[in-house]
Amino acid sequence: MIRELLLIGVGGFFGAIFRYLISGIVPVKFGLPTGTLAVNLIGSFILGFLLYCSLFAPIPTEYKLFIGTGFCGALTTFSTFSYETFVLVDEGLLFKALLNILINVVGCLIMVYFGRVLALAIFR
């Protein structure tokens, strides 16, 4: 168990640093946070590639923990959401995939709003 936690932690260390660097390098375009978009897209690609490769070839658990859970987890949680949505699509559950997208996007926006409301209530 300690080994697995270390793999996740070290992967997360590198994922967080990569997120910081990429977010700082990519300029804001069209008034949108394109740095965040960039890391979300990169993380989604990496996790999708890793997990879909594992359907066709054995990928060691250590790689999945280090790259998938650690690196991509720190880089973005959006990668897991994207992969899970495509699993629903692959299983022919298009309605559930669309519902997953709607709930995640709208739900996360609502939670940010609630966090904002709480922070303003505390610090104003």
Curated annotation (Swiss-Prot):
Quote the subcellular location field of this record: Cell membrane
Q: How is its activity regulated?
A: Na(+) is not transported, but it plays an essential structural role and its presence is essential for fluoride channel function.
Task: Give the top-rank taxon of the lineage listed in the UniProt record for this protein.
Answer: Archaea
Gene Ontology terms, MF aspect? fluoride channel activity; fluoride transmembrane transporter activity; metal ion binding
Q: Which GO terms describe its cellular component?
A: plasma membrane
Q: How does it sit in the membrane?
A: Multi-pass membrane protein
Disulfide partners: none
The UniProt record gives the binding positions of Na(+) as: 73, 76
From the record, give the transmembrane residue ranges.
6-26, 37-57, 69-89, 92-112
Sorted alphabetically, the keyword list is: Cell membrane, Ion channel, Ion transport, Membrane, Metal-binding, Sodium, Transmembrane, Transmembrane helix, Transport
Q: Name one GO biological process term.
A: cellular detoxification of fluoride
UniProt xrefs under Pfam families: CRCB (PF02537)
Q: List, alphabetically, the NCBIfam families matched.
A: crcB
Q: What does this protein do?
A: Fluoride-specific ion channel. Important for reducing fluoride concentration in the cell, thus reducing its toxicity.
Which protein family is it in?
Belongs to the fluoride channel Fluc/FEX (TC 1.A.43) family.
Instruction: Identify this protein by name.
Output: Fluoride-specific ion channel FluC
